[in-house]
Amino acid sequence: SIMKMDGSQQEENLDVISTGSLGVDLALGVGGLPRGRVVEIFGPESSGKTTLCLEAIAQCQKNGGICAFIDAEHAFDPIYARKLGVKVEELYLSQPDTGEQALEICDTLVRSGGIDMVVVDSVAALVPKAEIEGEMGDSHVGLQARLMSQALRKLTGHIKRTNTLVVFINQIRMKIGVMFGSPETTTGGNALKFYASVRLDIRRTGQIKKGDDVIGNETKVKVIKNKVAPPFRQAEFDILYGEGISWEGELIDLGVKHDIVEKSGAWYSYNGAK
């Protein structure tokens, strides 16, 4: 199809789904993750990738959205998801056997037009069928990258047409023999880097302690790529174990940053009230 961009065909306002973190929504520049686009969230282990996605699912469901979670890692915890505000009984969950099956399910869900948000957890766990059926130790060079490249070529058109948000969670690997620059890379080849409109790098920066007990993680998110707003913005927030993103803590930190809340020592005050 061909059309004139006179406003009759194209909506000017971008449809977004909140991440559940005020700081990340602000860093994204449009108030959330853009619908009709591919998003990649990557980081080291236990950095909060799945937590951020579950928080976004909870926000989407709050606004009446229908979400699907493709759990290729077979590590979905419904109890934890429920604590984060996810309506587990309304969530479509798939635990596929192969990478091909996972991406086929993703494509079917997107094409149906009845789903608002699909999360794939994770790209690293999308194992090609040939590798699963082969022997341990067999070499399957570039199979996963080819699989991702083909899937994304097929998916992007459907994603745009049905205005679905598709989030891929990804893990980090080290490149061998890198002398200069970062040795870190993400799995699954280069296709996802190109097709993703937004790429978020999430890292654990410290621990939150209550006495001697560790009760959460300090987390930093960098917007590495952004096609819908200026990139390279950052957000910092706390993830409390069993509770998710600390909304109150984030609100106070943002208040201090914008001089709405005053900080003196360990005390915070707003309009004179501590």
UniProtKB/Swiss-Prot annotation:
Keyword DNA-binding: yes
InterPro entries hit by this protein: AAA+_ATPase, DNA_recomb/repair_RecA, DNA_recomb/repair_RecA_CS, P-loop_NTPase, RecA-like_C, RecA-like_N, RecA_ATP-bd, RecA_C_sf
SUPFAM superfamilies per UniProt: P-loop containing nucleoside triphosphate hydrolases, RecA protein, C-terminal domain
Keywords associated with the record: ATP-binding, Cytoplasm, DNA damage, DNA recombination, DNA repair, DNA-binding, Nucleotide-binding, SOS response
Transferase as UniProt keyword: no
Subcellular location: Cytoplasm
Superkingdom classification of source: Bacteria
GO cellular component, one term: cytosol
Record HAMAP family: RecA (MF_00268)
Family per similarity comment: Belongs to the RecA family.
Name of the protein in its database record: Protein RecA
Gene that produces this protein: recA
